[in-house]
C-alpha cells in the first residue's frame, strides 16, 4: 500500500491496454458469481478466488492450507494464494473483448472528445459505432473522401462501382480505432495553429476547441486510440459485493448484473466468430456488446437505461461516483467515524462555559478502551478481555476509573447543520445521570440550538495531538467572537437578559430610598432583610468598591441601586462602575453627577436624578465586547458564566408571569378604525369618479390601513407600563418585539394573498379580542408561506455555502508578507444617501499601504504597513479622512493563498492571523451562514416610476457570486466626461443619453421607463451607471479594470447583507471575489507555448511570460475573465476537488485526456486521499513536531496483540 502522507501529487491518465493487463490478476471468462449450493465462488467467474484472492483470511478455497504460517503459498489443489481476504478489495481482473468497444465517456461527453480528435460530428460517430453506417478508412485510388460516411446501401453501390478491395470502409468501434491510430498529432496541431491565424467566427471557435484536445493528447502522452477498449478491467469483488439476506436470498451490487451482460455477450460473440456466422448476426452481437459496455460504464447516458426488477435503472460505474450518494461525497469527503454518539440535548445551566454534560452510559461506551487500559494497569482484571467483561457487566469499580479517564480529555460536540466553524466546539465532559447531553446555554447561539428536541453528536479526539488541538483551538470558552464580523457571539439571551434587566431597574420612592451603606456587603444584608428593594436608589461609599475612580470621585458617596451594586460586583476589576446603560459610562467612566460629598442631603439629591433605564440585551453585548477588548478570552468567559448565573437567579426571583390582563386595551381603537374606514370610502369614491387609477386606489387603501396600524402602535407605546411583564420582555430584548405586541393589543393589519399581493381587507381584530373565522382564514396563508419559505431558503442557502466553500477551499494564509506594490483605496460604502458600511468599520483590523496624514495639520496618523486598530480607525475618521489606501486580498501577490499583511486580523480571535489559517473556508462559511436570514423575495421598487424588479436577498447574492446578468440591468457609460444631453424619443419609447469626453462621445439608448441616475451637466467616470439598477459585472470588466469590478462586487454583496442587518467583514467577501477573477484567457500566445483561447490561472500566465521575456521573446497577451463560483470551482487546477463538486464524469474525462496532475494544494483533495490537510498544524512547517506527553502513559496495544495471538494458538491446539 502507498503511504498516504508520503506522496506529493496524484495523476490521472487514460489506461493503455498493457496497463490494464498489468493490473489484472486473471481473466474473468464466465458470468457466474457463486455456486448456489456450496455458496463458494465459481471458477473463472466474477468472484473467482484464484483471480481475486481468498474469501477467508489465510485460508485457501479447498481448505488444504489454513492459518497464517502458510502465508504466500499458492495451493496446489485449488490454485488460491493464502493471504488476507482484504486483497479482494484491491485485486482486479479483466475481460478480453472479442471486438473493440468505444468508451462512452469519450464519445458521448460534451464536447465529444472522439469527435474533436477526428473532426467528425458526434452524430456520424454514433452511426458508425452502433453499426448504422460505414466510414471510409482508406479511399486508396477512388474519389471517395477520407472519413466520409455511407449507409449500407451506398456502401454496396460503391463496391459495385469501384470493385472489391478498391477502398477500405468499416463500421463499429473498430473503424473508429483505425481512424484514431491514423491521427498524426504534431501535424494536426501545426495545421490548426496556421488556420487560427486567419479563421474567425464559428470556424475559429471550433479550431480552438480541437487544438485544445489534440494538444492535451500530445502533451500528456496519451494515445487517442486508447479511447477505444480492447480489454475491459473488472473491479475487485468486494467493491461490488454479494451478501446473503435472512431469507436465504442474495442481494448483489448492480455492477455484477452489468458485468454479466458484458461477459454473456462477449462469449456469444466469440462463439459466433468461431462458427464464421453471417456478417449481419456478428454485427448485431457486436452492437449489443457495445451497448452492454456502455451500460456498465454509464447506464442511461445513451438510449434507455438497462433496468433491474421493478424497472429501476441499474447503477453503473459512473453512478458510483456521482452525486451526494456517490463515492466522492459519501465515502471520501465525509466518513462515519467510531468513538462517536448522538443524543437529545438538554440545558445545563450549572455548567461552566468549557463544560458539557455527558450521560454515564454514553461516556463508558465512548471511553471504553481508555477505561480498559486503566483497569488492566491497576490489576483489577488480568487481561483486556476480562476488562471488557467487567465494563459490560457494569461493575461498580469502573465508574471511578471513568471519572479519572475523562478528566482533562476534551470531547467535540457538533450540531447539524454545521453552517460555520462554531458548529463544532470542544468541551470538557462532566458525567451526569439521564440520557440527554447537557449543553451550556450561552453556546446555543453559536450552534443555533434550542432545547425543543434538538440532537447533537459527540466525538472523542483520540491522539495526544488531537486532544491538544481540541483544548487549545476549539474549547468553547475560546470562541467568544463570531468569525464573520468579529462581534461577540455569546451574548446572554432570554432569561439571562431578563434577570439582568430586572436587576438593574430603578424605581423612585421604593422602601429605604436614600439609605447610605459603608460597603456592598452591608447593602446586600439590608436587601436580604427587607429594608431596601433591588430597585431602591441608595448611596454607597466609593472607597469600598474596587473600581477605577477619577480623582474627584474618590472618598465620595455614590448614588446607585442595590441591584446595580450586585450587577457591578461580578464585573472584572478595572472596568468602570456601570451606572448608565451607555457607551460613555463603559469606556470613559461613571458620570460625575452621581457622586456626593459624605454628609450631603442624599435624599434630595436622589429625588432630582432622572430614572435610568435598565441594561438591555444590546448593552450586555457592548459590555462583553469591551471586556473582551480589554481582558481577552479567559476573563470574558468567566464573566459570561457569572452573568448567566446572575441572570437566571434574578429572573427566577423576579417571578414574571403573563396573563391576559397584561395585554392592555387601547381606548380609542374604535375611533381610529372608524376614521380609516371613512378615508377608504373617500378613496373609493375618487376612484369611481375616475379621479385616480386602480393602482393608485390600491396603494392609497393599503397605505391608509398601514397608517391606522401605526397609530395604534404609537398609542400602545405611549400607554405601556414599564413594569408590564410583556413590555419588560420586549424592552429588554429577551423575547418578542413591538410588532408582536401590537398584534396582541392593537390590530393584526394587512395580510398577503397567495399570489404575494397584499390584500386590501385588513384584519382589524387583535389576539386579545380574538379573530373572526374569516380573519383567521386570511391569516393562515401568510403563516404557511412563512414555513415554506424558510424550508426552501435553508436548502438554497446550504447550496450557496457549498459552492462558496468549494471555490475558496484552497485559500490559506501561506506567508507573512507578499511584498505587493499595490493597494486598495477604500471609503465608506453608501447607496444614494443611505450609509451601508462606514469607513471606520472597513478600516478596523487591516494594514495600511500608504501613510495616512491629517488632512488639515499634515501630522502622520499612521505609517505604511501598520495595523489599524479600533482606536486608530476612529482617529482617522474623526480627522476627516475620507479615503485610505489599505493592503487588501484583492492586491495580494501570494500564490495559492493570501499573506498575513494583506488579510489583516483574524476576526475570530481579534489577533493577527496565523500562517496556515484556512481563510477561504472561513470566508465561505461567514457568507453562507447568514444566508438563511436573508429574504427570498424579489421586491418591486414601488410606484409606477420603474418597470424593473430589483432582486434582493438570497437570490441577489447568488446572482452576484454566479456573475449572472442581473435583473433590471443599469446602462453604463464607456466614456469619461460630461452628460451633455438627454433626449426622449416618443416614437420608439426610449431616451438617449449623450456623454462627451476628451477621448470621444458616447450615445446610450435607455428604456423610457428606466429611472435616470444622472442629469445634464453631471460628470461621469468610465463604467458609471446612467440609470438605476445593477451593473452587469462582465460588462464593467470590459469597460474598466479588474480592481473596479472587485470593488463593485464587494459593495454589492455588502448592500444585500447590511440591508438585512447582517454584518460581514469585507475581507471574507474579498477572498471570494478574488477567486472569481483568478483566470485569464490567452488572446495572443506571442512566443510562449500557450494556446490561443486557453483559460488559465493568472499566476501561471505571469510565469510563462516571465520565462519568455528573460529569453528575449515576445510575451503573450490575455484578457481577465470573470467566472461565477460554480464555474470557477470546476475550472480549479485540482481535478479531485472539481470532480467531487459537480459534473464528476465530465471533469474526470477531461482530466484523464490531459493526464492532469493534482498537486494536492487545497483542503478537499487531501481529505479525499486521506492525507492530513495543509492548513493549520498540517502545514509543512509544523509537520515534524513531536508531541510530548506531560505524564508518560504505558501503551498496551502490543500486549493486547500478544494476548490475542496466544488465545488464538490455544484455540488451535484444543481443536
UniProtKB/Swiss-Prot annotation:
Catalytic activity annotation: RNA(n) + a ribonucleoside 5'-triphosphate = RNA(n+1) + diphosphate
Keywords, in A-Z order: DNA-directed RNA polymerase, Magnesium, Metal-binding, Nucleotidyltransferase, Transcription, Transferase, Zinc
Listed GO MF terms: DNA binding; DNA-directed RNA polymerase activity; magnesium ion binding; zinc ion binding
Lineage top rank: taxon: Bacteria
Cofactor, free-text remark: Binds 1 Mg(2+) ion per subunit. Binds 2 Zn(2+) ions per subunit.
GO terms for biological process, alphabetical: DNA-templated transcription
Annotated binding of Zn(2+) 2, by residue: 818, 892, 899, 902
Any one GO CC term of the record: DNA-directed RNA polymerase complex
E.C. designation(s): 2.7.7.6
NCBIfam families (alphabetical): rpoC_TIGR
Function: DNA-dependent RNA polymerase catalyzes the transcription of DNA into RNA using the four ribonucleoside triphosphates as substrates.
Homology family: Belongs to the RNA polymerase beta' chain family.
Subunit: The RNAP catalytic core consists of 2 alpha, 1 beta, 1 beta' and 1 omega subunit. When a sigma factor is associated with the core the holoenzyme is formed, which can initiate transcription.
Protein name as it appears in the record: DNA-directed RNA polymerase subunit beta'
Organism: Streptococcus suis (strain 05ZYH33)
This protein's encoding gene: rpoC
